[in-house]
Curated annotation (Swiss-Prot):
Coiled coil: none annotated. It is an enzyme of class 2 (transferase). Catalyzes the conversion of S-adenosyl-L-methionine (SAM) to carboxy-S-adenosyl-L-methionine (Cx-SAM). The gene is cmoA. It catalyses: prephenate + S-adenosyl-L-methionine = carboxy-S-adenosyl-L-methionine + 3-phenylpyruvate + H2O. Keywords: S-adenosyl-L-methionine, Transferase. The keyword S-adenosyl-L-methionine applies. Homodimer. Its EC number is 2.1.3.-. S-adenosyl-L-methionine binds at residues 40, 65-67, 90-91, 122-123, 137, 204. One of its GO terms (molecular function) is carboxyl- or carbamoyltransferase activity. This is Carboxy-S-adenosyl-L-methionine synthase.
């Protein structure tokens, strides 16, 4: 996977456009997300480990918002249930093209990987097959808030008994002091990873109208409203967390 450094916002922009997952972002995405999301490599690797516990023979495993395929590859490496296949979905044509290239290259490096089908599609309109695992890694926060419950409800209906939804998201906090502290700590994380104040400010301007994070409590309440019986937080680093939701 490309290691091109993220310099997208390093020069002053007269007008900062809304963030989109286009070819420019795709080229630098691995570097961008590693330097922007604390704990990201840990989440990705362990998504495969978690999925192996819930995967059932002959079922689909979904990676919704697959981007360049890191989570998909983690699922393929760790899950050993017979007859499983991964369905990786993203609505960005640039992401899908590079995802396919990456996964094809992985096929030549690893043996006994699960088969994968990469789709360019809108997950809001996607008909789900019966599934034992659904992974949404920093995807729901880019869905319009008023469409999130309906999507989660459809995912819940597709999940088989004993399956799981693994949902990773950036969090906001109802407590103002906690929100301010964790926001500043996240900015410190970005600074420590080499982002300038200009880059941080312009990226924030680009993404604030596109990404709408929720509180942990909102996620838990919505998941229960969608029909999930249990919601278990399994990871948090600063204002980024991952949850296991059980049907």
């Amino acid at each position: 996977m490309s290691k091109q450094p993220d310099r997208l916002f390093s020069q002053p922009l007269e007008q900062v456009p809304d963030f989109v997952f286009n070819e420019d972002v795709v080229r630098v995405f691995p570097d961008m997300i590693k330097r922007s999301v604390p704990g990201y490599p840990t989440i990705v690797e362990n998504l495969g480990v978690l999925a192996a516990r819930f995967a059932q023979p002959g079922t689909a495993l979904y990676d919704l918002g697959a981007s360049l395929g890191a989570v998909t590859q983690s699922l393929r490496r760790h899950v050993r249930s017979d007859g499983c296949r991964v369905i990786a979905v993203d609505n960005s044509a640039a992401m899908v093209e590079r995802c396919r290239q990456y996964l094809t290259a992985q096929d030549s490096m690893f043996q006994e990987l699960l088969p994968v089908h990469v789709l360019e599609a809108d997950i809001l309109a996607l008909p789900f097959e019966p599934a034992s695992v659904v992974a949404m890694n920093f995807t729901l926060q880019f869905i319009a808030p008023d469409q999130r419950l309906e999507l989660l409800g459809r995912i819940r209906q597709a999940l088989l008994p004993g399956g799981a939804l693994i949902l990773s998201e950036k969090l906001r906090f109802a407590d103002e002091q906690a929100q301010d502290l964790l926001n500043e700590l996240h900015l410190d994380f970005k600074r420590a990873n080499g982002y300038s104040e200009l880059e941080i400010a312009q990226k924030r301007s680009a993404i604030e109208n596109v990404m709408k994070p929720d509180t942990l409590e909102t996620h838990q309440e919505r998941l229960r409203a969608a029909g999930f019986s249990k919601v278990v937080p399994w990871f948090q680093c600063l204002n980024f967390a991952s949850l296991i939701a059980l049907p």
